[in-house]
Swiss-Prot record:
GO terms for cellular component: nucleoplasm; nucleus. Residues 1-102 are annotated as: Disordered. One of its GO terms (biological process) is negative regulation of transcription by RNA polymerase II. It comes from Mus musculus. InterPro entries: EID. The modification Omega-N-methylarginine is found at R63, R79. Keywords: Coiled coil, Developmental protein, Differentiation, Methylation, Myogenesis, Nucleus, Repressor, Transcription, Transcription regulation. Interacts with EP300 and acts as a repressor of MYOD-dependent transcription and muscle differentiation. Inhibits EP300 histone acetyltransferase activity. Acts as a repressor of TGFB/SMAD transcriptional responses. May act as a repressor of the TGFB/SMAD3-dependent signaling by selectively blocking formation of TGFB-induced SMAD3-SMAD4 complex. This is EP300-interacting inhibitor of differentiation 2. It is found in: Nucleus. The gene is Eid2.
């Protein structure tokens, strides 16, 4: 009677160990059946299957990778398309605006470098705009090029007259010659008008005489010599 529990316990231990060695599988997920030892037939068949699939396996894998990448690219484009279009439109709108702002800034800088108009050069009754940019351009009058050197036209003329004292005399002499020439022309014209009233048939001859007298007058000859044009005139 005392050995019955021992005898009855031995088969239970063996059954439990056999149950642990057997592959277990549960319905609805859980531990799956553990792979058992490979059979001799399967071991011999694996190298042959690998040899048959060897050339085609990399190509199939590459095709599968490309197909998957193409599907992922289309999906990403479909997801980002509606959002990317507004972003692209905003960038396209910001491009001209940024270019216009940069151009206006450059023009304002050029206006600042050229300087504001002098107080005495400002037009009367016209508002003076001190704001930078394109708003100041219509009312801005550029300075004389001599202002780049830091002097104005009056200072330059004074400097020229002080360093070249002969210049005023030459200018006055030329002005006097011009005045005498104009007066002589008016006098000759009046004389020819009177002569035309007396004898209209002599008009052509008088015109020729006037031309000869004009080119040989004491007013023109010194002026021609002064300007250096006498060397280009063939005199007989």
């Amino acid at each position: 009677m005392s050995q019955l529990p021992a005898v009855s316990s031995a088969p239970q231990t063996g059954a439990a160990s056999r149950d642990r060695r057997l592959p277990q599988a549960e319905v609805g997920g859980g531990r799956r059946a553990l792979p058992g030892p490979a059979r001799p037939g399967e071991t011999r068949g694996r190298p042959m299957a690998a040899a048959r699939e060897g050339p085609a396996a990399p190509a199939a894998a590459a095709r599968g990778g490309r197909v998957a990448a193409a599907r992922e690219g289309r999906a990403a484009a479909a997801r980002g398309g509606p959002g990317a279009a507004p972003r692209g439109g905003a960038a396209a709108r910001e491009g001209p605006a940024a270019a216009a702002a940069s151009r206006e800034a450059r023009m304002a800088e050029v206006a600042r470098l050229l300087g504001d108009p002098l107080e005495e050069e400002a037009p009367e009754g016209r508002p003076r705009s001190r704001a930078g940019g394109l708003a100041a351009m219509p009312y801005m009058r550029f300075r004389h090029p001599l202002s780049v050197l830091g002097i104005n036209y009056q200072q330059f003329l004074r400097h020229y007259l002080e360093n070249y004292p002969i210049a005023p005399g030459r200018i006055q002499e030329l002005e006097e010659r011009r005045r005498r020439f104009v007066e002589a022309c008016r006098a000759r014209e009046a004389a020819f008008d009177i002569e035309y009233l007396r004898n209209p048939q002599r008009v052509d001859f008088d015109i020729l005489t006037f031309t000869i007298a004009l080119t040989a007058s004491e007013v023109i000859n010194p002026l021609i010599e002064e300007l250096g044009c006498d060397k280009f005139i063939h005199r007989e």
